[in-house]
Amino acid sequence: MNNTIFDDVFRTMIEKMPYLAVPLINEVFHTSYPEDVKIVQLRNEHQQEDGEIITDSCLLIGKKMYHIECQSTDDTTMVIRMIEYDFAIGIEHAEKQGRRYRIEFPKSCVLFLRSSGNTPDHLEADVVFPDGNTYVYSIPTVKMVDYTKDSIFEKNLLMLLPFYPMCRKTPCFSYGDIRRVHRIYASN
């Protein structure tokens, strides 16, 4: 597995401070969970015959699963990896109903730390089933470039702060900004 420092930072935040993901989930999926909602961290390691796949995050809020991947650059194969990850998550949490199974994919998104004009708002793939039915697998993307430091604070997307400097060419935080973050974290 090729981890980047960004993967490590993202996974550590999810593991140690999962409540930071709630505003991001609300932003992306148009939900309105309170910041103190109960969050269950699901396994992010999934065994497959050809090896283990590791996702960045898999969270359960209420009865909904959420899967967020952090990507440092726009990778055109990401949609295929997301289908693989989501299928592994769905299989692991499949519900047996008599002789039939219900496999539900999590609500997923990709956080692109760097993106270009070609980075889509949704990653999509056509999935053709044996009966000929085609379903569009579509997941939203979150692009750091779309957020200013002010919008990060206004929307309480503090999870994005460690990644903000990498998508800016000029210094982006003042001493006052750092004190503001310290006050927010100290109050939690």
Task: Place the predicted regions along the sequence by residue.
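Elongated, amphipathic alpha-helical interaction scaffolds
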Residues: 1-188
